């Protein structure tokens, strides 16, 4: 679990340029970390989401659904290597990680209280696949 408060703070400050730069920098750091972990922890579940939205225009929490993405580390690694994963993953056509696009994905919208049970179910399914 990693919580990065700076993204929220920059939203409260209405500082769009620095917020974009911070998100891009974090994206690079997470990508590098996942590549390193991928050598050892291929079945690790990777989840990216937020605990709430902070609207840059009003500088306060806005209570829209947060974008949420989940994958196995092995699938992330295959994607970054340009491999075809069509047989390996439940995919959708979402091409951008934002509130509107992610809500249109296969996960749709769901309350945050369901996240842990959802992840437990994914973990159990991975164990079943690996044992067969």
Where are these regions (language model features)?
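Feature captures the catalytic ectodomains and active-site-proximal regions of enzymes
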Residues: 1-132
């Amino acid at each position: 679990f990693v919580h990065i408060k700076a993204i929220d703070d920059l939203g409260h400050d209405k500082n769009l340029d620095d917020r974009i730069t911070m998100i891009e920098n974090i994206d690079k750091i997470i990508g590098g970390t996942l590549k390193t972990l991928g050598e050892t922890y291929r079945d690790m579940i990777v989840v990216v989401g937020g605990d709430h939205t902070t609207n840059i225009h009003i500088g306060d929490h806005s209570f829209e659904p947060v974008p949420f993405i989940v994958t196995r580390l092995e699938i992330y690694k295959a994607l970054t290597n340009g491999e075809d994963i069509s047989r390996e993953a439940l995919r959708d056509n979402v091409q951008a990680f934002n509130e509107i696009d992610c809500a249109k994905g296969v996960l749709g919208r769901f309350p945050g209280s369901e996240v842990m049970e959802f992840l437990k179910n994914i973990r159990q399914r991975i164990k079943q696949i690996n044992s067969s």
